[in-house]
Curated annotation (Swiss-Prot):
Gene Ontology biological process terms from the UniProt entry: phenylalanyl-tRNA aminoacylation
Predominant location category: cytoplasm
Superkingdom to which the source organism belongs: Bacteria
Matching NCBIfam families: pheS (TIGR00468)
Locations listed in the record: Cytoplasm
Cofactor note: Binds 2 magnesium ions per tetramer.
Organism ancestry: Bacteria, Pseudomonadati, Pseudomonadota, Gammaproteobacteria, Enterobacterales
HAMAP family: Phe_tRNA_synth_alpha1
Coiled-coil residue windows: none
A GO cellular component annotation in the UniProt record: cytoplasm
Organism: Shigella dysenteriae serotype 1 (strain Sd197)
Record family assignment: Belongs to the class-II aminoacyl-tRNA synthetase family. Phe-tRNA synthetase alpha subunit type 1 subfamily.
A GO term for molecular function: tRNA binding
Listed name of the protein: Phenylalanine--tRNA ligase alpha subunit
Gene3D superfamilies, alphabetized: Bira Bifunctional Protein, Domain 2
């Protein structure tokens, strides 16, 4: 054990000269491995008297601890130097553009709904909603639609049973609103509606917006003025607009509204009319005192006309190439 101090000094010198972690590990094995110089010193204890062995073992362990501490310190130095060298080599060009984060956008039909709600909100209309699973009273009977009307046929309506169905229009919201509150009433009712049809211009589910005003002294002139302002605001053009006589069971007189397209042809955009007296009576409103007008329009239809979309089904196919056009 007389040369123990020399072994420690030799180990520390080798540690300080190690140029990388691999070389340092070789030094560790040489001095502290199973057959290392300091490890083998423990075998000399058997040559000592029993009473001297504990003190001698403590001295050897102290020497090993000094070498281990030197190894740890040098390893930290080498790892730090390697990290600094790697960071210096891996320079970052801060002038390069970053990765672009894709922002989402509103669906074109949602944009149309928001635009219409904003316009009518400025006119004092509030948004009303109702159930999509409706009963035949609110969807048909209260709206003056008789039992023999084609809309009640199985091929046009999704029926659950004899009285429950997927609503074919949001007009049921008007009925529920008129039964729940007295005039004056001024609402719009956006929502999903369902009809058994599917082709280039029809889908089984689509979005509809209906409007309703009930008050005293409401006339067809009020209806025409409101819809003129709305259509010119929505399309952002001084459109040529015409009201064409039509028939709806729940309005009298009734009309369909057309706008002149860029191709010189009339395009139907919505239906409207004065609320039928029978509808007012069905909800407990006196038609001798109050009158009103109502209108309804398909959101997909208006969106197609506004953005020049030719196939209604494009709105439901989730094709990002199509949807990104409307950001």
């Amino acid at each position: 054990m007389s040369h123990l101090a020399e072994l420690v000094a030799s180990a520390k010198a080798a540690i300080s000269q190690a140029s990388d972690v691999a070389a340092l590990d070789n030094v560790r094995v040489e001095y502290l491995g199973k057959k290392g110089h300091l490890t083998l010193q423990m075998t000399t204890l058997r040559e000592l008297p029993p009473e001297e062995r504990p003190a001698a073992g403590a001295v050897i362990n102290e020497a090993k601890e000094q070498v281990q501490q030197a190894l740890n310190a040098r390893k930290a130095e080498l790892e730090s130097a390697a990290l600094n060298a790697r960071l210096a080599a891996d320079t970052i060009d801060v002038s390069l553009p970053g990765r672009r984060i894709e922002n989402g956008g509103l669906h074109p039909v949602t944009r149309t709904i928001d635009r219409i709600e904003s316009f009518f909100g400025e006119l004092g209309f509030t948004v009303a909603t109702g159930p999509e699973i409706e009963d035949d009273y609110h969807n048909f009977d209260a709206l003056n639609i008789p039992g023999h009307h084609p809309a009640r046929a199985d091929h046009d309506t999704f029926w659950f049973d004899a009285t429950r169905l997927l609503r074919t229009q949001t007009s049921g919201v008007q009925i529920r609103t008129m039964k729940a509150q007295q005039p004056p009433i001024r609402i719009i009712a956006p929502g999903r509606v369902y009809r058994n049809d599917y082709d280039q211009t029809h889908t089984p589910m689509f979005h509809q917006m209906e409007g309703l005003i009930v008050d005293t002294n409401i006339s067809f002139t009020n209806l025409k003025g409101t819809l003129h302002d709305f259509l010119r605001n929505f399309f952002e053009e001084d459109l040529q607009i015409r009201f064409r006589p039509s028939y709806f069971p729940f309005t009298e007189p009734s009309a369909e509204v057309d706008v002149m397209g860029k191709n010189g042809k009339w395009l139907e955009v919505l239906g409207c009319g004065m609320v039928h007296p029978n509808v007012l009576r069905n909800v407990g409103i006196d038609p001798e005192v109050y009158s009103g007008f109502a209108f309804g329009m398909g959101m997909e239809r208006l969106t197609m006309l506004r953005y020049g979309v030719t196939d209604l089904r494009s709105f439901f196919e989730n094709d990002l190439r199509f949807l990104k056009q409307f950001k």
